[in-house]
Each structure stands twice: as structure tokens, then as C-alpha cells.
């Protein structure tokens, strides 16, 4: 079976409960490695009145060298150690504060995630599944990242792309956790062309639509529309480039050379992967809109996530594209209001994420 490295997220949230409750079923489809120290797992188990049986847990430690070892088997748990350069000393002796924002749990969740990421990168597992973190807890811990995807960009020096959804609807995010006021400035021909090229090469979707940035996609310039003009130009260029089968070197050169862009467009005939004009976002998510195109790109976070979660919240997942590792996540937060209360918790997104990761790993 495929091996999944699973980071625990913020231990003050619902992640640990999802992990423990789902372990038996998850183990039927993969071999999970949970990145948590035994004493913290015991504390959480006591609070939840739940036990984790027949599982593999990985204690991670800051060290200059990478080293993975089996330590012992105890109380039906297989305990491993994974040493790597984390940049922080690991503190696993703090108290769990159910439902609270806490710097210690924030830092621990980050280190669990970083260790699990490199565990996959070092080929000890086939994919990474991350449980939800709290961005404020990361900030309070002194971390500079706005979330998992932002950190992965830094770890692997790649332009990671966030995609969310399910088989009925997937949406790629051109921008993620930045203020709305900054999105327009980010929409440039170069930035968008690179994104569209990478998004297609990672997904190979047959038809992709871009959601307009302005109301009614600019309405022919009546409501703004400058961003839509840039989008149309980038769409035409990327469609022509993908059709041409030319290489990355040519792409980089053509980004700066309008004559090469014109040459590509003159030689391009027929339909492209991307629909030629931005879609009006307020109708793109209707039944008719999704029947026409259910693989979309949004210029900003909430333009995609508000309708996606209204339609498919329980089964949507988060996928990081354009990385040297496979990374998936649940598409929900820490749910501090439900943590350690034996509340009803839906685990569908967790299982969908695991299945998606397994299927992706079978293709690589």
C-alpha cells in the first residue's frame, strides 16, 4: 500500500480527533505515518477519551543531518524518529489548550508539517496529507508563512499552486492569502501567463475557464475591465504556446518578446485549453455554468471558495500543485468550537484527500 505522511495541524483543533477516529478505515487504503510525539498523542487521547491502535508515529527532531530510524514498538504503536534541519528546537511538552490560539501549538503544528514534507521529499512516503493549522497561531509563533502552500514555496523554491475542489468542480487560485487591494497589482501578463502554463501542465484538464476579476467580467469596460484585458492576452498567448509544443526556454523568451508572441498567435488555429474570454463569475457556478466548464481559475481567494464551499464543502479538498512532492489537505479549518467536545465531525474531506493523494501517487 502507498505510504502517507500526515502532519497533525494545530493540536488544539479537531485535527487529532479526525486522525484517531479515521485511523482504522484509513489503514485499509494506505499506510499512514503520523508526525506526532508519543507524549502529546497520549495527552490528546486522554482529553478525547480515544486511543490510537496499530499505528505508526514519527517523532521529529531538529538536526543538521537527515536520518530516519525505527525506535520501538509500544502499546501497539510503532515509534520512529526522523531527524532533519528544522530551524527550531522541538518542544513536545506543552499543554494542549482545547479550542485556543496558542504559539506553542502553532509552532509544533508547523514543525510536524515541515518534517512530514521532507519525509516525503526524502522518499520515505509517497504523499503528504496535512491537517488544518491556525494562521494566527503560526504568526504568534514568529513564523512568516501565511499557510501551508506559502511555506511549501519556500521549502522547495517552486511556484506552488493552490487548487481546491472535488470531481464535480476544481478551482485553481491565482492569488491566495493576500489582501484584496493587492490582487489587481499582481495580475500582470507575465505573472498570469506563467501561472496558466504551470496550472495546465500540472492538471492536464481539457477545458479551463478563468473567472473575471471585475463584476460581470468588466462588462465591456463599463465596470473596470483592465484586468480582463490582461487576462485575455495571457489566455491567447498560453493557448498558442501549449498548442505549439515549444519548450520552456522559448516560453521565457516569448514572455518578453511581442514579435514572438505575434508569431505564436498567427500559427495557432482552433480551440485552446483555456476558454478565450473571462467568465462572468456570478453565473459560472450555476448548474448551466458548471455544465459548460467545471475546471476554473480564480484571481482571488473568496471568489472561488465562497461558491465552492456552498456547493461541495463536505467533500472538497486542497491540493498543492507544481511541487516536487504530492501534497493534499482537508478543505476546512481547525474548528476550535468543536475541539475535544465529542462533537459530530465530518471526516469526508479527510478521506477524499487521502484517496486523491493515493491516486496521484499511482500516476507518478
Swiss-Prot record:
GO function terms (MF aspect): 4-hydroxythreonine-4-phosphate dehydrogenase activity; cobalt ion binding; magnesium ion binding; NAD binding; zinc ion binding
Keywords, sorted A to Z: Cobalt, Cytoplasm, Magnesium, Metal-binding, NAD, NADP, Oxidoreductase, Pyridoxine biosynthesis, Zinc
Principal subcellular localisation of the protein: cytoplasm
Binding of substrate, residues: 148-149, 309, 318, 327
Pfam families per the UniProt record, alphabetical: PdxA
Signal peptide residues on this chain, from the entry's feature table: none
Name of the protein described by the UniProt record: 4-hydroxythreonine-4-phosphate dehydrogenase
Gene this protein is translated from: pdxA
